[in-house]
Amino acid sequence: MLFSAALCFANQISFQIVQHDDSADNVTEDSMIIEDSVLNTFFEYGYIVTNSDAAISDSENQDEHLYKIGSGEAFNGFSDYFIQIKLYYERTDNTLSASSDLYKINFTIASAKSGVKIAEKTLENLKVDRTKKNNLAKISTDLVSQINKALKANKA
C-alpha cells in the first residue's frame, strides 16, 4: 500500500476591529457581530485566523497606537498579514434604532513580517437594514471578500 501525504500551507492572518462611535462607551454589539462574522468568513476561506481585542478609538493618533499594538501581536504570533478594520458609526435624525448606524468601513492590510502596508480601502455609504436579521453578517462577508481580493492580488 502506498500512502501519500499532501501538505497544505494556509496563510495566517491577524485582524483588529477599531470602532469609531461618539455615542458608545464600549465596543457595541454591532461591532462584535462584524468581528465574529469576519473571523468565521476568513476561516471558511481557508485562512488561519487570529484577532486582537476589539477597541474604541476617537482619533487617528489612537488608531495608529492600536495599529502598532495589533501589528506587533501579529508579528509575535507568526501571522503573515495584519489587517486593521475601522468601523465608523454615526447618529443622525434618520437613525431609527437605539444604536448608531454603521456608515463607513476602512481596512488596511500589512505584511506582519515586514510591516509594509500593501493595501488600503474604504467602503462608504453602507446601508444597514435593521429589519433584516443577517444584514451585518452580509456587510461583513462583503468586507472579507474585498480584503480577500486584495490579499490574492498580493499573492496571499
Feature annotation, model-predicted:
Residues 9-10, 76:
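Short intrinsically disordered, low-complexity segments
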Residues 17, 22-83:
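N-terminal segment of the mature soluble domain
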Residues 53, 86, 113:
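Residues at the C-termini of beta-strands that transition into short coil/loop
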Residues 16-18, 86-88, 126:
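A structural detector for beta-sheet-dominated domains
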Residues 10-14, 34-37, 41-44, 92-94, ...:
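C-terminal/domain-edge helix-coil "capping" segments
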Residues 79-94:
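Charged, amphipathic alpha-helical segments
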